[in-house]
């Protein structure tokens, strides 16, 4: 990339771990939990956290600022299913879960575990029963925090309903970080006016002031990339709205009915969600939704929603011809409140371009050989850094 712009680097190391994360940010129908994380340590080195590389363990590796391997830690899994990792700046948090096929209200199905920066376990808290048979089913899990409040947005397969089916929806949890107590959660059935989305195939969560702002990939109720802004003040320890403060919501992109196969298919993959100085930014790749039953090539789109949810501007970033290679689900990297880096993979190349606060393109698209992964890139010294690994390479 040209001088003065952000450089993008993928780092490869020849280490024999099982699995691969190549292009794992991408999906066809529903997403999966993010299993690859990279953070910048206080001393300027890098720490990567990888789930699934070693059975029963969370792999933690440290690298120098020049990407030289330094040391490795193996952290025992808490509950059997990994959900997410989060670095709050002062502590690490790991979300895990376990299946509950017998619908046992006394079984812990979600657990949030707090560690110090040396990976010493401090304390954990959890939800029991919670209308959950399979945590993280057909979706993802992400965490954020503001002040002493840790916020979780994920999903689950629910207890069998009156129609005899186990449906899937999103889940939201709030944790008081100093005491590690869950102060609020919602795992029931409601409607989008209360932040409920079903099915929810991908989940994102941010804060804006004292309000939660979340994004879900819905296929039915509603069938859209739906942005939800809670009018409640989560700093009270409670986020779930009452009748008089229902959430504000907007269908960022509505997905037409799909009649050529199962209705779960929406022709879209959401890759990024963030908050700019003026807008809520949503990045995704979709087929030509006007021809959802026949279109196969996906292009990248960025939506900018005003903070009062009154306006919604769709910016088309790519124009790949139908029948050619698709763009993957993109990665959206925040540089500052007015600037973002958008990356997507296509064939054997990575493409990237800078965005303004309103989601419009700032400059030219740059292309280079490489791969993306489910590792959210981090910004350090003007560089976007992520990692890719593959047991076969």
Residue ranges and their predicted role:
Residues 4-12:
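Sec-dependent signal peptide cleavage junction
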Residues 11-393:
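Extracellular, repeat-based ectodomains that mediate carbohydrate processing or recognition
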């Amino acid at each position: 990339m040209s001088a003065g712009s952000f450089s993008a680097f993928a780092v490869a190391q020849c280490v024999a771990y099982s699995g691969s994360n190549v292009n794992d940010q991408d999906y066809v129908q529903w997403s999966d939990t993010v299993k690859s994380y990279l953070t910048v340590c206080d001393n300027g080195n890098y720490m990567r956290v990888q789930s699934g590389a070693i059975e029963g363990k969370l792999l933690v590796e440290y690298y120098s600022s020049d990407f030289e391997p330094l040391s490795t830690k193996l952290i025992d899994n808490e509950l059997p299913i990994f959900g997410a990792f989060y670095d709050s700046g002062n502590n690490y948090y790991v979300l895990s879960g376990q299946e509950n096929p017998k619908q046992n209200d006394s079984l812990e199905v979600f657990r949030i575990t707090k560690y110090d920066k040396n990976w010493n376990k401090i304390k954990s808290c959890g939800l029991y029963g919670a209308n959950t048979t399979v945590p993280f089913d057909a979706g993802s899990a992400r965490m954020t925090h503001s002040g002493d409040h840790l916020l979780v947005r994920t999903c689950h397969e629910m207890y069998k309903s009156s129609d005899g089916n186990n449906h899937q929806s999103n889940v939201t949890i709030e944790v008081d970080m100093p005491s590690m107590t869950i102060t609020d959660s919602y795992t029931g059935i409601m409607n989008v006016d209360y932040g409920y989305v079903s099915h929810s195939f991908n989940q994102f969560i941010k804060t804006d002031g004292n309000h939660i702002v979340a994004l879900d990939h819905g296929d039915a109720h509603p069938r859209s990339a739906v942005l939800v802004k809670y009018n409640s003040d989560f700093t009270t320890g409670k986020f779930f709205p009452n009748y008089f403060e229902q959430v504000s919501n907007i269908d960022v992109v509505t997905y037409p009915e799909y009649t050529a196969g199962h209705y779960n298919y929406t022709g879209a993959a959401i890759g990024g969600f963030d908050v700019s100085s003026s807008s809520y930014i949503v990045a995704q790749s979709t087929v030509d939704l006007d021809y959802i039953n026949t279109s196969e090539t996906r292009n990248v789109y960025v939506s900018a929603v005003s903070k009062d949810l009154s306006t919604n501007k769709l910016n088309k970033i790519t124009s790949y011809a139908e029948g050619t290679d698709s763009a993957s689900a993109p990665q959206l990297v925040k540089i500052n409140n007015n600037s973002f880096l958008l990356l997507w993979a296509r064939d054997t190349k990575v493409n990237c371009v800078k965005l303004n606060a309103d989601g419009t393109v700032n400059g030219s698209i740059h292309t280079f050989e490489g791969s993306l992964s489910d590792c959210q890139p981090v910004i350090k010294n003007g560089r976007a850094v992520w990692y890719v690994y593959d047991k076969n390479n």
